[in-house]
């Protein structure tokens, strides 16, 4: 009996010890600490109401999350004094928000700026209190450096490795300037001289002596962080340059149309440089101009809907994905050329002018029209899209996908099942069409797509406009979307349930017969 009592006592002691250990090592914030715990419902509103937030996405069972917790609690207490909240999201209990934030490892720390929930920056520094607090304080307080005199500016210019932006006395711009500085603190240095009588906004590039002044209406920037950001990103780019890989992302992030000149030799590049530099200067802030070596980047022209015939000039609007180019030769004629055919300079200038005026005609890419449809998911191509989606009698559901997109691949079998279910019911077969289009192989000018897969429903009727599906891509939600948004209000879920009840009944009958045998 004594042994039993000791044994039980040991077990109880062990359990108590284990409980205290687990409590000590819990990844969740200690009640009463400055480390806040958020849920999916509160996440969006919290981020949108704070200019700077550090968020930990964690899993309760994760040892690394448990180790990080005390460091975050200390950091939260320090950062609270600087009005920078530190919060937690438990990914086990809030899986949807973690999925939306593409959280793949635990713990993941993300920095959210200016209330944007889908633009979080992953913190890649050391995950200890001092490093975290130092980084966040510097990000918040040093995003704009306030100076008292012109003499204090010079050291920043002499030692600059990043573009230096200077706000001289434009106090009305302060709030917008601070917001943009917070966003771009890792790419620019922002200085502010509040008492200056100069009243100007300028940017100094490293290793240059002449500043670039903002020569527009400053009032157009006040309260308009997008416009200020756009100016900063565009003005640092040359009028025309032979592109380097590390510079290309800056052109992409400017969101301006990109004009490409593919050259075949250094002599050819030199011959056209003055023309394109002048065009770049005349169209600053409207079109960016770059050169590409056709030997190094021959296949890039495929993304411009053009053939590999060099030299070549084309314009790509990356917002709506429309492409414009000079006329090209038939393949047979191009193959007979003994040397590159020069581009017509007047035609280059005219294409740029027509593009700016909105009269240039885009190059439309389309697969060939299928001779037969091989499944219940109807294949649409660029040439047939508009005729098919605007149907007097049918609701038309269209999936715009990309072959390289993992989300498109995951959704494909679900979409196929939706089509099969609706095709199984004769009463709705003529009232709805389930279709898809490969956006990488077909240009749809009437409906530019920027994310994949995009699901849109065109209700029956000639003048119907697409209704975008924005819920979880599963069977139930898509059926509900069709029912609520379509002209015919087809209840796909009811058809699905009826179909599976019939199958279950067949299986039950077969089992009964088998048992009787």
UniProtKB/Swiss-Prot annotation:
Q: Which family does it belong to?
A: Belongs to the protein disulfide isomerase family.
The EC number of this protein is 5.3.4.1
Q: Which GO terms describe its cellular component?
A: endoplasmic reticulum; endoplasmic reticulum lumen
Which residues, if any, are the signal sequence?
1-29
Output the GO biological process annotations, alphabetical, semicolon-separated: protein folding; response to endoplasmic reticulum stress
The effect annotated for residue 408 to C is: Increases PDI activity
For this UniProt record, the keywords arranged alphabetically read as follows:
Endoplasmic reticulum, Glycoprotein, Isomerase, Redox-active center, Repeat, Signal
GO MF, one term, reads: protein-disulfide reductase (glutathione) activity
Please name the top-level EC class of this enzyme.
isomerase
Compartment list = Endoplasmic reticulum lumen
The glycosylation sites annotated in the UniProt record are 159, 174, 207, 293, 462
Say yes or no: keyword Protein transport present.
no
Q: List the Gene3D superfamilies.
A: Glutaredoxin
Q: Where is the Thioredoxin domain?
A: 30-141, 355-487
Q: How does it assemble?
A: Interacts with EPS1.
Q: Describe the task this protein carries out.
A: Probably interacts with nascent polypeptides in the endoplasmic reticulum. It is an essential gene only in the absence of PDI. Its native disulfide isomerase activity is very low.
Q: What is its main location?
A: endoplasmic reticulum
Instruction: Name the reported effect of residue 65 to C.
Output: Increases PDI activity
What is the name attached to this protein's record? Protein disulfide-isomerase EUG1
